Amino acid sequence: MFEINPIKNRLQDVSERTNILRGYLDYDAKKERLEEVNAELEQPDVWNEPERAQALGKERASLEAVVETIDLLDQGVEDVDGLLELAVEEEDQETFDEIEPELAELEAKLAKLEFRRMFSGDHDASDCYIDLQSGSGGTEAQDWTSMMLRMYLRWAEAKGFKVEVIEVSEGEVAGLKGATVRIAGEYAYGWLRTETGVHRLVRKSPFDSSGRRHTSFASAFIYPEIDDNIQIDINPSDLRIDVYRASGAGGQHVNTTESAVRITHVPTNIVVQCQNDRSQHKNKDQAMKQLRAKLFEYELQKQNAEKQANEDAKSDIGWGSQIRSYVLDDSRIKDLRTGIENRNTQAVLDGDLDKFIEASLKSGL
């Protein structure tokens, strides 16, 4: 005899949780909006306004992720229930054995959709920037900053996000003094926002001939890209704009023209840089976009005293504001906020960050 009750209980659980999500994620409204967006994208003149068309395409992908997944879950429950009936009726072990992998796949899809509930912040759906800055530790810290850049790039690419390196500042001997990256994709800021903070590395330094253990620090600061419709008032007299020759991953034109741009907002001392284009004008536009986003985040922090003052934390990158410790000799990476550990240090440095990120989001950080 087949053990059908556990299967029936799991099917009922999937069905009930799907119905909860249907209401929570406003399935009916999203399905109606998806039809409207599809109709608009089918219009022959839609690409007369490229920015509008791109925004619609992004909205469609977001809507489909909810609507199509719920449709698949509904259909999947029906299909598995049908398989169960057939297996029992025909007393067919082979058919019964097909149920477990199909049901497990449904449960995985459901868990992934449920995780979207973590992205409830006002700007979680936005693209974002990652600012990395080396701290205490000299060359070792600068090498650690370059390792962190690689780690986040690997993570983002594995997630299917679009990655753009906006600016890098080379270290004096090796590594990076700092870097800025733009991450574009669904819930990019939602995924990364809890990564803001100081990351501590402990290892035997390749830059120390004695092979001693060194401790070094680098910070990550994550902030959302803001919609052009949001009004951010910037007084031109508050800005100091410097141009310089690009000095890193900027292509063949590096060090040949002063195309790189650095903008300092004097009242807040916020600095943004861009060197990823040949055109000084384009680099200035991108830097201003970053500045608007940083000022927006800065104002949010001022209004919400409970929110960690990330920009202040950047000024003292050391022991005080760590979020994660990477102890390579002991094969141990530990998140100091959630207690989550991973002993596969190479996998983490290769971008396997989901375990840490998901735990921090679930804990409400």
From Swiss-Prot:
Transmembrane parts of this sequence: none
Keyword set, alphabetical order: Cytoplasm, Methylation, Protein biosynthesis
Keyword Zinc: no
GO cellular component: cytoplasm
PTM statement from Swiss-Prot or TrEMBL: Methylated by PrmC. Methylation increases the termination efficiency of RF2.
Residue numbers bearing the N5-methylglutamine modification: Q252
Protein function: Peptide chain release factor 2 directs the termination of translation in response to the peptide chain termination codons UGA and UAA.
Protein family according to the UniProt entry: Belongs to the prokaryotic/mitochondrial release factor family.
The protein, known as: Peptide chain release factor 2
Native organism taxonomy: Bacteria, Pseudomonadati, Pseudomonadota, Gammaproteobacteria, Vibrionales
